[in-house]
Amino acid sequence: ESRITLWVPRIHEQHTRRIWNSNSRVSPDIRITSTNRPWTQARYSDLAITTGGQSSIEALCLGVPTIALPELAAQKDFVYFLSSIGACISVPDFATADLRHLATTAIATKTLRESLSRIALQTIDGGGSSRIIDTVRSLI
């Protein structure tokens, strides 16, 4: 299937509509899914639009290219770090950003999505659980 899938977790439908303009419809080639269960939808998505919280970490783990719209200070710091290493596209000012253009460009540019995905996967080494177990054992 040549359809592009956007994963939009934890972002209200009204914000998603703003991305595409309230009076326009999303292209029939684009499917938007907003489930908060990444293991069921995100891993099959071509692009994620997140707020820079836990869903961004889930997208990293799954290698899903991400556009981040941070809302809280901690999210802004995390998104700044991710964007500085090329793991996501940061949108620091949601109110003035041309999100439709940004999302459309990211969707249309396969090399950009592949680069974001590759860098995202490189930031996750899969050893977090082992390090936690080792730390807990060292305390016992």
Report each predicted region and the residues it spans:
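Nucleotide-activated sugar donor-binding and catalytic core shared by glycosyltransferases
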Residues: E1-I140
